[in-house]
């Protein structure tokens, strides 16, 4: 199976890693979607298929399956909010929330 991230980038996805920008940029778009999880990704696909210019914003990095580290101690800090240490306010429940393009659906 082809890597969907590499296929998308080769097919014309525009990817900007804002952490590498020297200064702010202005982006002209019809729709801005914050969060690239299941809901954001599907919505972006539908809106772009309808001819709208869509920008997705995500806190974490764009990772391909070839970028994933298989050791949990290496992977968690890169893929989860707060290195997978996020908890409810009373600290009773751990919250595994993805911090990468695709959000929790990726991890």
Regions found by a protein language model. Give the residues of each.
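N-terminal redox-cofactor-binding region of secreted/periplasmic oxidoreductases
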Residues: 1-107
């Amino acid at each position: 199976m082809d890597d969907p991230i590499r296929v998308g980038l080769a097919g014309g996805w525009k990817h900007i890693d804002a952490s590498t920008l020297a200064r702010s940029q202005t982006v002209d778009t019809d729709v801005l979607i914050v969060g690239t999880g299941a809901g954001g990704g599907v919505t972006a696909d539908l809106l772009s298929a309808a001819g709208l210019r869509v920008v997705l914003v995500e806190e974490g990095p764009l990772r391909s399956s070839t970028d994933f580290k298989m050791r949990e101690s290496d992977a968690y800090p890169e893929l989860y909010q707060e290195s997978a240490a996020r908890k409810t306010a009373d600290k009773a429940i751990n919250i595994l929330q993805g911090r990468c393009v695709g959000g929790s659906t990726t991890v």
